[in-house]
Curated annotation (Swiss-Prot):
Subunit description: F-type ATPases have 2 components, CF(1) - the catalytic core - and CF(0) - the membrane proton channel. CF(1) has five subunits: alpha(3), beta(3), gamma(1), delta(1), epsilon(1). CF(0) has three main subunits: a(1), b(2) and c(9-12). The alpha and beta chains form an alternating ring which encloses part of the gamma chain. CF(1) is attached to CF(0) by a central stalk formed by the gamma and epsilon chains, while a peripheral stalk is formed by the delta and b chains.
Cystine pairings recorded for this chain: none
UniProt xrefs under CDD domains: ATP-synt_F1_beta_C (cd18110), ATP-synt_F1_beta_N (cd18115), F1-ATPase_beta_CD (cd01133)
Gene source species: Escherichia coli O9:H4 (strain HS)
Protein name in the entry: ATP synthase subunit beta
InterPro entries: AAA+_ATPase (IPR003593), ATP-synt_VA_C (IPR055190), ATP_synth_F1_bsu (IPR005722), ATPase_a/bsu_AS (IPR020003), ATPase_alpha/beta_chains (IPR050053), ATPase_F1/V1/A1_a/bsu_N (IPR004100), ATPase_F1/V1/A1_a/bsu_N_sf (IPR036121), ATPase_F1/V1/A1_a/bsu_nucl-bd (IPR000194)
Length: 460
């Protein structure tokens, strides 16, 4: 085991000098004793002359030149398997929940090759989420990749927690949650939410939160993914939740300049597409098992053309776009039904009835969008009878796309609702065909199935 010495420390980036004949490989883990703390460094570049440039997987406070550094001669390895379920771990797989050792039987390196072409499998099976707007407009595929896109404060994390609750309870498989650069409070809330709904023993939690150094945030997604890959390779269907994939990119940006790379567009790292690809290509389903992933994607300044969300788009099967405009109307989940897409929305996959209903809903909402300008200038009275009907139905559809969430009961005061796909299609089809034209639009707001809307109308 070779030993080197620290020669330079710039924030999270540490340069270490080794003997010329024992230079560590790229991605090898190094260990340094920083006072009472053990700090792990990951090799990023070999600079020549025996010097390697590394990223610290923890705070570099207190490091000084001349400290001894050990080469562990392997990449960072984390615990995998059933021992990780119900536990909270950090980027190195160390427990942070005060419940003692993990007690794992196996450890895997966090850098692994993506599955080869012949190992990949293609599934057309739908995953029901119980959230009306998602099941109807952008259905999820089992073993597919889903992105929740939204600016600050439009409900990405709440939507994700609802999805985890619904899918974990209904689907009863294992899940891995990777908290990448998010609020510690949300991580804490999430743990208690899982404990209260009795699914904590089926979830592994890996956190590298906002206050952690960039090295942790850059690698914690890989730690969570490695744990999910182990479950997949045992032949299971796993769910991988990443909140938030944008912070993974951001952590890469933070260390990129310190590693001496020229910034590219908007100051992002030049290797943005490659870093994203390395992560996303591993999140895939094989003939042995599947990984279904749901990723929250923060959209800087609500601009979907920003390089980071734009790079993420290319890798996804379904995109759920959360809109500030819809949130401002008080309609939650604030999913934009005209912007959200899914590869599964194909009559050969979802069936003709589902496809026609979804496209019908979109065309009514699109027409309403076009008529809004006329209404703003001339008022409703100037519209033709046909257009008045379209507007009335569109407003009902818009309200019926809202739904009370289980995880938001504390805020809304109304009990959460899980709506089956069959009921969702029936409800929207009925509104489009004019079966509920006699009901007031308020009856459709924050209800589950269409029967509840009819009941609510009687009380208004």
């Amino acid at each position: 085991m070779a030993t080197g010495k620290i020669v330079q420390v710039i924030g999270a980036v540490v340069d270490v000098e080794f003997p010329q004949d024992a230079v560590p490989r790229v991605y090898d883990a190094l260990e340094v004793q920083n006072g009472s703390e053990r700090l792990v460094l990951e090799v990023q570049q070999q600079l020549g002359g025996g010097i390697v440039r590394t990223i610290a997987m923890g705070s570099s406070d207190g490091l000084r030149r001349g400290l001894d550094v050990k080469d562990l001669e392997h990449p960072i390895e984390v615990p995998v398997g059933k021992a990780t379920l119900g536990r909270i771990m950090n980027v190195l797989g160390e427990p942070v929940d005060m419940k003692g050792e993990i007690g794992e039987e196996e450890r895997w390196a966090i850098h692994r090759a993506a599955p080869s072409y012949e190992e990949l499998s293609n599934s057309q099976e739908l995953l029901e989420t119980g959230i009306k707007v998602i099941d109807l407009m952008c259905p999820f595929a089992k073993g597919g990749k889903v992105g929740l896109f939204g600016g600050a404060g439009v409900g990405k994390t709440v939507n994700m927690m609802e999805l985890i609750r619904n899918i974990a309870i209904e689907h009863s498989g294992y899940s891995v949650f990777a908290g990448v650069g998010e609020r510690t409070r949300e991580g804490n809330d999430f743990y208690h939410e899982m404990t209260d709904s009795n699914v904590i023993d089926k979830v592994s939690l890996v956190y590298g939160q906002m206050n952690e150094p960039p090295g942790n945030r850059l690698r914690v997604a890989l730690t969570g993914l490695t744990m999910a890959e182990k479950f997949r390779d045992e032949g299971r269907d796993v769910l991988l939740f990443v909140d938030n994939i944008y912070r993974y990119t951001l952590a890469g940006t933070e260390v990129s300049a310190l590693l001496g790379r020229m910034p590219s567009a908007v100051g992002y790292q030049p290797t943005l597409a490659e870093e994203m690809g390395v992560l996303q290509e591993r999140i895939t389903s094989t003939k042995t098992g599947s990984i279904t992933s749901v990723q929250a994607v923060y959209v800087p300044a609500d601009d979907l053309t920003d390089p980071s969300p734009a790079t993420t788009f290319a890798h996804l099967d379904a995109t759920v776009v959360l809109s500030r405009q819809i949130a401002s109307l008080g309609i939650y989940p604030a999913v934009d039904p005209l912007d959200s897409t899914s590869r599964q929305l194909d009559p050969l996959v979802v069936g003709q009835e589902h496809y026609d209903t979804a496209r019908g809903v979109q065309s009514i909402l699109q027409r309403y969008q076009e008529l809004k300008d006329i209404i703003a200038i001339l008022g409703m009275d100037e519209l033709s009878e046909e257009d008045k009907l379209v507007v009335a139905r569109a407003r009902k559809i818009q309200r019926f796309l809202s739904q009370p969430f289980f995880v938001a009961e504390v805020f809304t005061g109304s009990p959460g609702k899980y709506v089956s796909l069959k009921d969702t299609i029936r409800g929207f089809k009925g509104i489009m065909e004019g079966e509920y034209d006699h009901l007031p639009e308020q009856a459709f707001y924050m209800v589950g199935s269409i029967e509840e809307a009819v009941e609510k109308a009687k009380k208004l």
